[in-house]
């Protein structure tokens, strides 16, 4: 291939790969397989290797991260990134609405058009595109001066390196919030604790810490996302309103929050705030309120700014997810990987509508740093599904004689030696037969998202261990009715149900089986990737590190962990014993010709005919995709009782709305 042909093909590959990146990371509806994507990327890499002078800054191959920096350079924003005034109740919101009308000389009966947006709890950044290419990115900083984090922002998969429009405006400055979703946050903290590193306190800190890494290669390994929400300077294109701007940005490849809504009047603003508050716990990311902006840019200019904040916008904060309680005890807890964690037993207190009686203290260094002691009065915080944590000690209320819990001299469960590996903050039990590790391993194996052995809860697992009926998960498949009849308060029918549940688990999907094995760093999503790539446990067991790394989203940490797991003879023996007992993981295959091929479904409200997990599986088994939010790409919304903002969004966009019965009829054909 000559240079001219290579240049044309490289440009074509840029467009194609960028489009598939957008579909995968922003729309969450891929059109090609990972293998097909990898072929495109490899072709581009090969062409760039042959013609290095054709490598451009906005090439998809340049996302992996540049060399580490010594420090971040400070940069000035051409337009200040002002902070927002806060409101904390309905009265303050009505005052805001009245102030705007008085300032503009409008009658109080006039309904102002507002745009309401979920207030993301992340890190504000500015992206600068020149002639369509991302050339610069910075943090908000103090609103006037931020830090140059261009190379790190280029690793965020949902940020396009080039705008999806032709011709692009000559200059586009856009502001957005970089965030880390709750599921990636929990996995990141789990990985850090297993690696002996201190966990992040919350998703916001994790996002900020990830984006401010001097080594962009570390940022590239963190699954950060972005929602854009405001323009800076724009040349070559004119926006007339906030709503028009938010409708245009996705056409350029820049993601915006799908829950944003344009409303008329303050009463509609109050209703939106209540709706978002009701759905807050089910969102896959953290929000801490709602941002309300006057929609018209002409009115925004008329209103102007105060010293630190615009007059035309306000942030209405949610009530804090914190409460004050007392630490009644601190108990060491052993996890399935041997990490020993101090756990605070609390006087029960309600936080965000949930009764909290325990909170993780993460590790001894963290506990000592926060100076948390038995009997202390503390502030606990609960964020989404994240385990409650102690965020502050009220030392002025400390009881005399309160002492820190000492690091245990031996494992509190089995008495084995404990170690603190250099460079780690975690302490670990080295006991190969530690009952706590075995218990947690079996509980994980039997859990709903793993082998789903119905009825096999914590109490039964503890009895199995106490009676020495199991030592590994493989032993579950050799249990008899006679074994279960040794349990306390066990009847014939219940024993038979447990045996039937164990039998039914023998043919679970391969991805569930891989997840159930408890391989470090392999969660549900990664297990699905591995199952899809290798098709059987035998093939996965023989996979080389190179083969593992060829899978999209599988990095060195996961690849090494998988190889380490299968190199362990004890692990292979457990798997062989399960296979000998009749365990045959089934390979799940998406039906390319299924009823729902190419269709995207969203489920909302209280479902009574099936669970959300069941619904997702039904859609995916028929070749479709189940998404978490409604957009113009959504084909169907299935609405249960008390459906809220997602149903409103569907009606606003003209998306087909189905009842549960109508969905089941579609499924049956």
Swiss-Prot record:
List of residues binding Zn(2+): 411, 414, 429, 434
Cofactor (UniProt): Mg(2+); Mn(2+)
Enzyme class: ligase
GO molecular function: DNA binding; DNA ligase (NAD+) activity; metal ion binding
GO biological process terms, semicolon-separated: DNA repair; DNA replication
Family membership noted in the UniProt record: Belongs to the NAD-dependent DNA ligase family. LigA subfamily.
Entries under HAMAP family matching the protein: DNA_ligase_A (MF_01588)
The protein's name in its UniProt record: DNA ligase
């Amino acid at each position: 291939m000559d240079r001219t042909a290579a240049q044309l093909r490289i440009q074509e590959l840029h467009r194609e790969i960028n489009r598939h990146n957008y579909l995968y990371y922003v729309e969450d509806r891929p059109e090609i397989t990972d293998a097909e994507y990898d072929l495109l990327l490899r072709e581009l890499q090969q062409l760039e290797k042959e013609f290095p002078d054709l490598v451009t800054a906005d090439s998809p191959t340049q996302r992996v991260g540049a060399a580490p920096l010594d420090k971040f350079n400070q940069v000035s924003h051409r337009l200040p990134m002002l902070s927002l005034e806060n409101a904390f109740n309905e009265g303050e919101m009505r005052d805001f609405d009245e102030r705007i009308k008085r300032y503009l000389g409008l009658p109080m009966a006039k309904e102002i058009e507002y745009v309401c947006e979920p207030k993301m709890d992340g890190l504000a950044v500015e992206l600068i595109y020149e002639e369509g290419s991302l050339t610069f990115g910075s943090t908000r900083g103090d609103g006037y001066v931020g830090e140059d984090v261009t190379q790190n922002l280029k690793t965020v998969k949902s940020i396009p390196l080039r705008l999806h429009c032709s011709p692009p405006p000559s200059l586009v400055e856009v502001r957005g919030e970089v965030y880390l979703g709750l599921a990636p946050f929990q996995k990141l903290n789990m990985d850090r604790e297993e690696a002996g590193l201190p966990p992040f306190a919350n998703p916001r800190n994790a996002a900020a810490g990830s984006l401010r890494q001097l080594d962009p290669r570390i940022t590239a390994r963190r699954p950060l996302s972005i929602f854009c929400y405001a323009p800076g300077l724009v040349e070559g294109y004119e926006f007339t309103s906030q709503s028009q701007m938010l409708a245009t940005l996705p056409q350029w490849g820049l993601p915006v929050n799908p829950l944003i809504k344009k409303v008329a009047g303050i009463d509609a603003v109050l209703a939106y705030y209540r709706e978002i508050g009701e759905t807050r716990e089910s969102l896959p990311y953290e929000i801490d309120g709602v941002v309300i902006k006057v929609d018209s840019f002409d009115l925004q200019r008329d209103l102007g700014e105060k010293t630190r904040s615009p007059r035309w916008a306000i942030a209405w904060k949610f009530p804090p997810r914190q409460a004050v309680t007392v630490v009644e005890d601190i108990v060491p807890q052993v996890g399935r990987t041997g990490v020993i964690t101090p756990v605070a037993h609390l006087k029960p207190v309600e936080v965000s509508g949930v009764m909290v009686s325990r909170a993780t203290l993460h590790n001894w260094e963290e506990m000592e740093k926060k100076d948390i002691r038995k009997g202390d009065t503390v502030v606990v915080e609960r964020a989404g599904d994240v385990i409650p944590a102690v965020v502050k000690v009220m030392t002025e209320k400390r009881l005399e004689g309160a002492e820190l819990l000492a690091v245990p001299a031996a494992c509190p469960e089995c008495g084995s030696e404990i170690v603190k590996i250099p460079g780690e903050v975690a302490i670990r039990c080295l006991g190969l037969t530690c009952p706590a590790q075995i218990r947690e391993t079996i509980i994980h194996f039997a859990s709903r998202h793993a082998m789903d052995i119905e009825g096999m809860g914590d109490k039964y697992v503890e009895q199995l261990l106490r009676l020495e009926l199991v030592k590994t998960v493989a032993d579950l498949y050799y249990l008899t009715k006679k074994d279960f009849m040794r349990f306390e308060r066990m009847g014939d029918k219940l024993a038979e149900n447990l045996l039937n549940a164990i039998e039914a688990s023998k043919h679970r999907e391969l991805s569930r089986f891989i997840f159930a094995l408890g391989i470090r760093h392999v969660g549900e999503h990664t297990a699905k990737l591995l199952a899809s790539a290798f098709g059987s446990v035998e093939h996965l067991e023989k996979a080389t590190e190179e083969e593992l790394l060829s899978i999209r989203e599988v990095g060195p940490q996961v690849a090494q962990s998988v190889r380490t797991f299968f190199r362990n003879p004890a692990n292979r023996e457990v798997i062989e014993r399960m296979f000998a007992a009749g365990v045959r993981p089934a390979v799940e295959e998406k039906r390319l010709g299924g009823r729902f091929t190419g269709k995207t479904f969203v489920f909302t409200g209280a479902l009574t005919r099936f669970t959300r997990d069941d619904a997702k599986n039904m859609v995916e088994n028929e070749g479709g995709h189940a998404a978490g939010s409604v957009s113009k790409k959504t084909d169907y919304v299935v609405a249960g009782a008390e459906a809220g903002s997602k149903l409103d969004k569907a009606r606003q966009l003209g998306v087909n709305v189905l009842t549960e019965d109508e969905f089941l009829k579609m499924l049956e054909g």
